[in-house]
Amino acid sequence: MGNAILTSCQYQNYRRIDLIVIHCSATRATQRYTVDDCRRDHRARGFADIGYHYYITRDGVVHAGRALYQVGAHATGYNEHSIGVCYEGGLDIRGRPCDTRTPEQKETLQKLLERLKEDYPEAKVVGHRDLPGVKKDCPCYKV
């Protein structure tokens, strides 16, 4: 599917969307963590599928996660009215929080957010850490 998502009309959604929540996978800059790895780990935690609606790998490819009509599993207490977007990375080589987004990820994320804002103009874009009650560094950069 790849970046065709950015130009296709797959955004029909009947859920009210108030937030677009940006996440990182909390993996080291040197660690490969594919969308399939994320999906496997989320299912192992008891989720029905990957918790995010979109996942952006280091090469800048955006992968579809949960369908937008489905409630995500990415931000406890905020899932019902939000869309979850995750990028691969978020930790430096020592495992400390760090903005490890590649230029390709930054470009893809910007395009995806522009597209989502066209469909959900009232939605606020926030980092996971910006949500009240969240004690994480995710997405490891200022949104």
Model features per residue range: what roles?
Residues 1-21, 25, 58-62, 67-68, ...:
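Basic/polar, cationic surfaces and motifs that engage anionic cell-wall
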Residues 37-45, 112-119:
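Structured segments of extracytoplasmic/periplasmic soluble domains
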Residues 71-73:
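Glycine-rich phosphate/pyrophosphate-binding beta-alpha loops
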Residues 75-77:
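Short, charge-rich binding segments
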